[in-house]
């Protein structure tokens, strides 16, 4: 029994270290307004889809359903639009630098983004519509208060596997017109 408890304790302590191996899309925090971060994101490669079974289609792509039959590491975050009809995976930096293979699956596309400024607000736990709405409202109110103009629609970002139970990271984000004087 003592060995079982020790083994379980070791596994639980190690889980955050294992989770840290996931590559996170790089960004630089430029400024903070309360709980809202203004960030600079360099160019990145996304693989996007829409129209149902979005996660499955993107997972098939990184599992080898692409022109090179190349397996690609899962990264974070996963991007979703407000009604969850569109989803995108960020490609690892190495794939971005060499170029992502073309998808074989229908309704899956590779997109290279331009560098951009965004405003983001982070929250924990499992996400749901109530949390998303509250954080979207807080994000947009903070931007308005600080005279920062949002560009386009908000995006919802998930960083964790559904099997991660604690220290979960979610964000609501929107591209902004950024002026360093504000």
Residue ranges of predicted features:
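A solvent-exposed interaction/effector surface
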Residues: 2-5, 15-182
